């Protein structure tokens, strides 16, 4: 799934099929300035901590929030699709609050214009690693409800 153009770029380290929870800074040749995270069948809250350790202070990360892997099973519908806007808001809030609690600032939130394979609406959160947890927080007015409403308005057609 990794774009061929990116795969060929010498600045890019593709870590497909890698359990990021077990990667240490010693496993990577350099401290990362940027990382993108797209995980399946696991909550982002399980991987943000280990991924944070790989970033330089001030490093940034864009993560794909997939409601179907953040919500409890009782909130996931047929074919693994989460349609309820309130569940989308709940899981985004959960991921954002967790990210802040471990020392990330939230720079931006947007919905992905591409639905997941089964039709799930997914979201992109842009994070920045702060030197210490006290500096973490929202760096812009991220309105989760507004982003979810816009996503459903555009993609529920």
Task: Name each model feature, range by range.
Residues 88-102:
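Short alpha-helix
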Residues 104-113:
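Conserved S-adenosyl-L-methionine
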Residues 20-21, 67-71, 113-114:
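Short "lid" loop at the C-terminus of a central beta-strand within the Rossmann-like core
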Residues 45-62:
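A short glycine-rich, Lys/Arg-flanked "PGG" loop and its adjoining helix->strand segment in the class I
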Residues 1-46:
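S-adenosyl-L-methionine
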Residues 67-84:
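Short, glycine-/aromatic-enriched active-site segment of Class I SAM-dependent methyltransferases
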Residues 120-157:
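Flexible, glycine-/basic-rich loop-and-beta segments that form/coincide
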Residues 2, 66, 119:
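Residue-level signal for inorganic ion chemistry
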